[in-house]
Amino acid sequence: MVHFTAEEKAAITSIWDKVDLEKAGGETLGRLLIVYPWTQRFFEKFGNLSPPQAIMGNPRIRAHGKKVLTSLGLAVQNMDNLKETFAHLSELHCDKLHVDPENFKLLGNMLVIVLSSHLGKEFTAEVQAAWQKLVAAVANALSLKYH
């Protein structure tokens, strides 16, 4: 189990309170699909995923990105209980969707990039470290069903 210090929790929650879920979620998922195009196979039903402008402007991508970040909000609220918090989503992504668990890490890294670009100087190295720790822990929790 990952332990978050009080300072890390404060850094994470202070940033989370400023996140526009639809905007950041859509950009995070869009970047994942553009930077790692093999991930597009999980989203074929979302329509046109080429060129990159089509991905970034796709309302289904934005909506799903918001859904992903809404789920991540559960991590922010339950940092001390990530395994149980994401047990159902781990099972869904493993058994039904067959998502390679490495993609969870890639998505987390895309989120950190988006947060940094949206928040600028407020997203300090210390804040980034806390967020990297959180997204890695969430990726691990989502991967548990695979083991």
Swiss-Prot record:
Pfam families: Globin
Domain Globin: 3-147
Record GO biological process: hydrogen peroxide catabolic process
Keywords per UniProt: Heme, Iron, Metal-binding, Oxygen transport, Transport
InterPro entries per record: Globin, Globin-like_sf, Globin/Proto, Hemoglobin_b, Hemoglobin_oxygen_transport
Family listed: Belongs to the globin family.
Protein name from the UniProt record: Hemoglobin subunit beta-Y
Organism: Mesocricetus auratus (Golden hamster)
Originating gene: HBBY
